[in-house]
Structures are given as structure tokens and as C-alpha cells.
């Protein structure tokens, strides 16, 4: 694991082979829509206090570009530059030789709008959330074997963008399970196959009305009842909504991937992400490559265009660039 574990599963960090790690990532966003001023950037790092303990820090910043606000009649009001950021602080430690546990706390700031529009005072939203991560390291000393992890992430308070106390919404809490098996052929060649499952722990509002365009939407009463639910109880209710087991299966996103490394210096990756058509219908292929030299590593990935017309995903043709540094020798 490298410093990017701060965003996926920090319980992996105590098994890192270097004492200190840093990761920097940059992703131009929505380039397929000819948007040039939107990007996602992240910075992460870890420090191993002992062989079995580590602390980690993560920072994510999302710049949404310049947006022109209008009123209900389409009259231009003002331009605004929305942005969001999250700061994570985590601690992880080994539980025996093969298991580990990680805890993280996160501050979220979502500055989408400010000012008064249509008699409503809008402000930046904020929330405090936490993560609980578990990791099992089943690989042998040469790296071959099965590793897996379980995560409960973004468990936190509701967020609101106005002075109206009834307009608070749930943040996207998530349950994740990931597995990765590595086959080592010799000292120069190895390949890893990975499989991830993710489910949002957020209930669905009852869609008991129709919009002017014929879309199913919640009534004001249903939306108020939905927002009135407690945070902790909403995580449980996200499993017991209408539709039975078939609905629960549809809510699980699936991602598969493979990574090949030659001489621990040159890496090649490919993956596929699937989301049920009734739950968002995101489907795309990815490819990537990595190169390591001394303490530094460079990573690159690309999302292939998928779909057409209204079904084309906005993230088509998205590139991601990353730098990884591992320092301090072995710990």
C-alpha cells in the first residue's frame, strides 16, 4: 500500500514497507463536456510510528469552476466559483500479524453558493464524519496471496446549504468490501486481480408524485419526512427499503480490475465499473500505467468514452495523474 490508502482503507497503512509515504493526485473534471475550469486534487501522507502503528492525513479539493446563477425566469444574477474540500486525520494499527484496524475523522466543507436568492439565505455547508476500516493481509512475504478489506466510510452529520433547519440532507455514507489476489510468477513478474463492492448507506425518498416532465419525484410532505430521519437510523433503513432483495442488489456498485508489474518498476492496469441502470447507470472501462524509480512513482489513468447521447457518462475521456513518494527506508 502507498499513501493513497488514506482515501480507500487506512487500515492497510501499517503494512506499508516504507516509514513515510506521500501521494499527490490531479484530475481534470468533465473535460468531455468541454468544461475547462473544473478539477479534483488530493494530497495524502502517512507516517509509521512503529512497525504496527501509523498516522495518516488526507486533503481533497474540488473546484467547480465559474457558474452563472439565474432566477426562476432565467434572469442572470451573479457568477460564483463553488468549491468543496475535505480534511482527513487517521490512525491505524495492526491486530496481530495479518489483521489491522483504522479509524479516521473527516471535516467536510461544501461551498456551493452564498447570498440570498428568492428570499432564501444560502451558505456553505459543513459536516463532520468518520470512517472505520478493517484489513486482512493474507499475502506471503513474496507478495502472493489474498488480501481483503471492509470499510464503513463517511458516517457523519447531515449537511445544509441554507438557514432553514428543515433543509438538511444526508451525506453519502458508504459500505465497501474489497478483495485482491496477487500471483507472483518470479522476481520480475506479478499480477493482481481486484474486486470491489460498494453500497451507499443512504435511504431513498418516496417518489409519490410526478413532475411537469413526467419524472417521478417526492411530494413536499414525503421529502420533509425523509429529511426528518435520524442519521444512524438512516444507515439501517438503507437496507430495508421497498423492492426487497432485488432492490438491495441493484444498489451495489461493482468494480473489477487487474494490475501487472514488471520488475517492480513498470505497471499496467485495466478496470471496469458497473452501476445498475435503475441507480445511476454509470458504466465505464479504465486503463492506467505506472512507473517507479528509487523513492518516487508516477501513475496515470484514463476513462474510456462509454454510452451515447443522454446515456454517455460525463466522466468520459477523464485523465488522472498521480505522484507517489515512499521514504525513510523500511519500517
Placement of each model-derived feature along the sequence:
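Subset of outer-membrane beta-barrel
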Residues: 1-331
Amino acid at each position: 500500500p502507498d499513501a493513497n490508502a488514506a482515501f480507500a482503507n487506512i487500515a492497510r497503512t501499517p503494512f506499508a514497507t516504507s516509514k513515510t509515504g506521500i501521494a499527490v493526485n490531479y484530475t481534470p473534471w468533465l473535460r468531455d463536456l468541454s468544461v475547462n475550469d473544473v478539477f479534483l486534487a488530493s494530497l495524502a501522507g502517512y507516517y509509521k510510528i512503529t512497525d504496527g502503528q501509523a498516522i495518516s492525513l488526507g486533503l481533497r479539493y474540488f473546484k467547480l469552476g465559474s457558474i452563472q446563477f439565474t432566477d426562476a425566469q432565467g434572469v442572470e444574477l451573479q457568477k460564483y466559483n463553488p468549491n468543496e474540500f475535505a480534511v482527513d486525520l487517521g490512525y491505524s494499527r495492526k491486530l496481530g500479524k495479518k489483521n489491522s484496524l483504522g479509524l479516521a475523522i473527516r471535516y467536510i466543507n461544501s461551498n456551493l453558493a452564498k447570498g440570498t436568492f428568492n428570499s432564501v439565505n444560502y451558505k456553505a455547508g459543513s459536516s463532520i464524519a468518520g470512517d472505520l476500516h478493517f484489513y486482512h493481509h493474507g499475502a506471503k512475504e513474496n507478495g502472493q496471496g489474498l488480501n481483503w478489506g471492509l470499510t464503513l466510510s463517511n458516517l457523519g452529520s447531515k449537511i445544509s446549504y441554507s438557514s432553514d433547519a428543515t433543509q438538511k440532507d444526508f451525506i453519502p455514507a458508504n459500505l465497501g468490501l474489497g478483495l485482491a489476489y496477487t500471483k507472483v510468477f518470479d522476481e520480475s513478474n506479478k499480477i493482481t486481480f481486484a474486486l470491489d463492492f460498494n453500497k451507499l448507506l443512504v435511504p431513498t425518498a418516496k417518489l409519490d408524485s410526478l413532475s411537469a416532465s413526467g419524472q417521478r419525484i417526492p411530494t413536499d410532505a414525503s421529502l420533509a419526512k425523509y429529511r426528518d430521519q435520524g442519521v444512524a437510523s438512516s444507515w439501517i433503513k438503507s437496507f430495508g427499503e421497498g423492492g426487497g432483495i432485488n432492490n438491495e442488489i441493484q444498489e451495489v456498485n461493482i468494480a473489477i480490475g487487474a494490475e501487472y508489474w514488471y520488475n517492480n518498476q513498470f505497471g499496467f492496469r485495466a478496470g471496469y465499473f458497473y452501476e445498475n441502470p435503475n441507480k445511476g447507470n454509470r458504466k465505464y472501462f479504465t486503463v492506467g500505467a505506472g512507473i517507479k524509480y528509487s523513492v518516487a512513482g508516477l501513475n496515470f489513468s484514463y476513462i474510456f468514452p462509454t454510452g451515447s447521447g443522454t446515456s454517455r457518462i460525463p466522466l468520459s475521456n477523464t485523465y488522472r495523474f498521480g505522484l507517489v513518494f515512499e521514504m525513510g527506508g523500511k519500517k
